[in-house]
From Swiss-Prot:
GO molecular function, one term: nerve growth factor receptor binding
Record's keyword annotation contains Secreted: yes
Alphabetized Gene3D superfamilies for the sequence: Cystine-knot cytokines
Listed name of the protein: Neurotrophin-3
Chain's role: Seems to promote the survival of visceral and proprioceptive sensory neurons.
Protein's GO biological process: cell surface receptor protein tyrosine kinase signaling pathway; modulation of chemical synaptic transmission; negative regulation of neuron apoptotic process; nerve development; nerve growth factor signaling pathway; neuron projection morphogenesis
Gene name tied to this protein: ntf3
Length: 260
């Protein structure tokens, strides 16, 4: 734009200075020299401005852009099957305040549990505590079991706290690693699982107790259900997942061939 202005202004400037040059006997190329100097000054100014802009753009391009974090909670399937954990210590405090999805069969504690969860009976519990064989304890156990006299279970089961669970199958069918010892604060915390399983497949000779063996084949089988636990997959992606654990003993029946 400046060069165009100089080109348009040149004839006017030449007309004004023509008379003066005649009177003062100025050299003929004085106007050309003036015009060339003005153009050079303008070009130099534009070049400096352009270099300044390029320098700013290059500096901005070298600044690293912030990494985009993926929102795992945005995917509904991922949110249901896997919930990532950033800080284990903060997550433990959060679990103490929130009881949603919390199963009594999963315990996070710094010491070995000596009793079953409050919601489960102690009839079939085989814990690590010693039993004191005295008259008071026998009377207490008799009073607790008094209401169960005359009742029999089709299958015999046993329940215990599993303290060394290392692997499990999650709700997607993938094998995951169960976090054993979790380092937080002063003392480490471990995960304990209260599991129930069958003592034996056939409590009686022909299968389950109380089943008509003339018409039915029966067998006691351990059943599983899903609980939430802190796990990792391929030594990464630590978070809460639904995993299968043993929770009951049921009697499986099948009709004998040739029987109606």
């Amino acid at each position: 734009m400046s060069i165009l202005f100089y080109v348009m202004f040149l004839p006017y400037l030449c007309g004004i200075h023509a008379t003066n040059m005649d009177k003062r006997n100025l050299p003929e190329n004085s106007m050309n020299s003036l015009f060339i100097k003005l153009i050079q000054a303008d070009l130099l100014k534009n070049k400096i401005s352009k270099q300044t802009v390029d320098t700013k753009e290059n500096h901005q391009s070298t600044i690293p852009k912030p990494q985009i974090l993926l929102d795992l909670d945005g995917d509904d399937n991922m949110k249901q099957d896997f919930q990532p954990v950033i800080s284990l210590e903060a997550e433990l405090v959060k679990q103490q305040k929130q009881r949603r999805y919390k199963s009594p069969r999963v315990l996070l504690s710094d010491s070995l549990p000596l009793e079953p969860p409050p919601l489960y009976l102690m009839d079939d519990y085989i814990g690590h505590s010693t039993v004191v064989n005295n008259r008071t304890s026998r009377r207490k156990r008799f009073a607790e079991h008094k209401g169960h006299r005359g009742e029999y279970s089709v299958c015999d089961s046993e329940s215990l706290w599993v303290t060394d669970k290392m692997n499990a199958i999650d709700i997607r069918g993938h094998q995951v690693t169960v976090l054993g010892e979790i380092k937080t604060g002063n003392s480490p915390v471990k995960q304990y699982f209260y599991e129930t399983r069958c003592k034996e497949a056939r409590p009686v000779k022909n299968g389950c107790r109380g089943i008509d063996d003339k018409h039915w084949n029966s067998q006691c089988k351990t059943s599983q259900t899903y609980v939430r636990a802190l796990t990792s997959e391929n030594n990464k992606m630590v978070g809460w997942r639904w995993i299968r654990i043993d929770t009951s003993c049921v009697c499986a029946l099948s009709r004998k061939i040739g029987r109606s």
